[in-house]
A protein has these predicted regions:
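Solvent-exposed loop/turn segments at secondary-structure junctions
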Residues: 94-97, 123-127, 178-182, 304-307, ...
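C-terminal regions of proteins
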Residues: 42-53, 162, 276-277, 281-299, ...
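Bacterial N-terminal signal peptides that target proteins for export
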Residues: 2-9
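Acidic/histidine-rich, surface-exposed loop or edge segments in extracytoplasmic proteins
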Residues: 61-63, 84-92, 139-146, 268
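Active-site-adjacent structural elements in enzyme catalytic domains
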Residues: 96-127, 153-167
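A substrate-binding/cap region within the structured catalytic cores of diverse enzymes
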Residues: 129-285, 289
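N- or domain-start disorder-to-order transition segments that initiate the globular core
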Residues: 24-86
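Bacterial N-terminal signal peptides
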Residues: 9-17
């Protein structure tokens, strides 16, 4: 089970792991508190940029290991080569994983060329024009964050990717479905989307969107069961579901799961349809971009549930763009770091194991 990480670990962990890796530009008078930004709960990327510290200096093998789907070790260069050879790469993260966020920026920088496009779960399709306006320098960052409905952890976890994209003139896809329509489906069912105006439907994949596969439905039931059992920390729920999958299969067979969740089957199916709309929307955004720009490739950042085991977004993308080549990268924080466990096999084409003992990013 993923545990909540407390601030009291901060000094011990960072003194032993991070500080020796920091570039020599740090002076003796600059201690951990100078670098650590308490308002974000991690090493502030704005501090790193302002002081000219190379991002990779904070990332060593003391923080992550890279493996193929079977647990064979890979290098960072191996990973970048795989990214540049794929039409679409999914970077599946736990949203509080500080190492994942730094790796995402690093991989974006290392894989960058004129054909690279960034795609983010964290922005919704109806604010694509706002993202474009900010990247073009037309609006201020303050207005971008407000009008773009940025996540609360934007500054600490995603800003560096947007700023790099802005600097390089790289397209950024606001790929997720608007939350109001996700909520609509969870309450009223997916058929309710058909009543929307033609203007509203522009922000959604073609309707009706494909139903979730049975494997995806089983995985979602596992998540819902874990969520009900352990409480509302979603990053904990996502990872715990992998270790509890055998127990969930038994409960599915015995018909116990709906009773535990307090949901009837109709309510569960509507929640599943809402979750599935997220995945279909992100896949449709990526497919639409590549149909218009077939020379491009896409690096897409999403919560790992949306792409683990090649389920979710990859399934929909295969439907919308059958000939595309896809690479699934799952980033897994683990308390058994740096070991690759049997439970991680097949989670992604590439699995990056990170140190779960580090403080969360937010």
């Amino acid at each position: 089970m993923i545990k909540r990480i407390y601030m009291c670990i901060l000094l011990i962990t960072f003194v032993l792991v991070i500080v020796p890796a920091v570039n020599s530009q740090l002076t003796a008078s600059e201690d951990l508190i100078d670098i650590y930004d308490e308002s974000f709960g991690d090493f502030s990327q704005s501090y790193i940029a302002a002081n000219g510290l190379p991002l990779h200096s904070l990332l060593t093998l003391g923080h992550y290991r890279i493996f193929d789907s079977l647990g064979n070790p890979l290098t960072l260069d191996d990973l970048v080569a795989n990214i540049t050879e794929s039409d679409v790469t999914f970077l599946g993260e736990i949203h509080t994983d500080v190492v994942a966020h730094y790796l995402e920026v690093l991989l974006l920088e290392m894989a960058w060329d004129k054909n690279q496009t960034l795609s983010l779960e964290m922005f919704e399709t109806d604010v694509q024009y706002v993202v474009n306006e900010y990247l073009a320098g037309h609006i201020s960052e303050e207005h971008f964050l407000k009008s773009g409905r940025s996540w609360g952890n934007y500054d600490s976890d995603y800003r560096a990717m947007i700023e790099f994209s802005k600097e390089k003139g790289m397209p950024v896809l606001a790929s997720n479905a608007p939350r109001r329509y996700i909520n609509m489906v969870s309450r009223l069912g997916e058929e309710s989307l058909l009543s929307l105006s033609a203007e509203a439907k522009k922000y959604l994949p073609p309707l009706p969107y494909p139903a979730a596969t049975q494997d995806y439905e089983n995985k979602f039931r596992a998540i819902m069961s874990a969520y009900h059992t352990m409480g509302p920390t979603i990053s904990e729920v996502q990872e715990d579901a992998h270790s509890e999958k055998d127990d969930v299969k038994v409960k599915l067979a015995e018909g116990q799961l709906e009773e535990e969740l307090g949901l009837d089957e109709e309510a569960f199916q509507q929640m599943l349809a809402a979750q599935n709309l997220w995945d279909a929307s992100m896949a449709w955004s990526i497919a639409s971009h590549l149909k218009q720009h077939p020379e491009n490739r896409v690096l897409h950042v999403n919560g790992s549930f949306h792409s683990d085991y090649q389920l979710g977004i990859p399934e929909h993308l295969q439907n919308y763009l059958p000939n595309s080549t896809m690479l699934g990268v799952t980033i897994v924080p683990s308390y058994e770091f740096p070991d690759f466990s049997d439970a991680m096999q097949g989670m992604g084409d590439i699995v990056i194991v990170t140190d779960a003992n580090l403080p969360p990013s937010h």
